[in-house]
Amino acid sequence: TMARAPNLFTIGGESHRAIESLPGLHPSAHGWASNQLSASDASPEVIAAVRHSFAQSLRDRDGVAPRPGQPVRLLEKTPKNTLRVPFLREVFPGAQFVFLYREPREVLASMIEAWGSGRFRTYPDLPGWSGLTWSLLLVPGWREYRDLPVEELVARQWATTLERLLDDLESVPASSIAPIRYADFLAQPQAEIERLCARLQLPWDVALGTLPPSRHTLTKPEPDKWRKHEDVLSRVLPKVEPTRLRVEAFLQRLG
């Protein structure tokens, strides 16, 4: 939705290739540890290569590339970048981070469906992994997930991601973080997108009607869709409760 803001540029999709195709940035270059990248991965050569990789594909909401020398505000929304905040701050000094938060029960239900669908496979030939093809983020400690039921796997995947993200955001100025709750956005999309853009000092001139499903959505979003997986979720939600509480405290501090 934010890609419809004037004077905002995107590369038209997620940035898997724009980053992981560059030498040293694919997980295989780090022993398949995870998708995590740190500030130390951002050498001057890497910074230049990443910026060039993005610049080649930049388009605004009308599909127009930036003019030579035109200042660019880039919108990037690849989930893997949740594990790359320190790296991104080196590549894009002054970066602002939109923290889109969704309740764990809803996220975990969607993740269970994503793993089962086969549409979100990220590393089909992940060394040392067996069972369902690895899907979504490659998180630190993933090797410990072998032989886990999928609900346990996604619970750990989510909690690990959020814990690392919160650790990294602690060093980011609060003025550079813009929180938004998924449920609030679905309930009041116009008000929430205007509030978010105001916080980011972005203009907004679009009247939102009914929101179309994301192109990555498997089934239509509904508040109680998670209940399809209620039985298995009841076993893992208590395990992610400490992370949920930490997120809530963080959001409260941001205001």
Briefly describe each language-model feature range.
Residues 1-59, 215-218:
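PAPS-dependent sulfotransferase catalytic core
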Residues 5-6, 92, 172:
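Acidic-histidine catalytic/liganding microenvironments
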Residues 12, 74-77, 99-101, 179-182, ...:
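Short beta-strand segments
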Residues 17-20, 82-84, 105-110, 116, ...:
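Short catalytic/ligand-binding loop motif for oxyanion handling, primarily in non-cytosolic enzymes
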Residues 21-25, 88, 109-114, 119-123, ...:
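Short aromatic-enriched loop/helix-cap "lid" or pocket-rim segments at secondary-structure transitions
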Residues 54-84:
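Glycine-rich phosphate-binding loop used to anchor ATP phosphates in small-molecule kinases
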Residues 77-78, 88-114:
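Conserved phosphate-donor/acceptor-positioning beta-strand/loop module used by diverse small-molecule
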Residues 119-125, 129-255:
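PAPS-dependent sulfotransferases, especially Golgi type II membrane carbohydrate sulfotransferases
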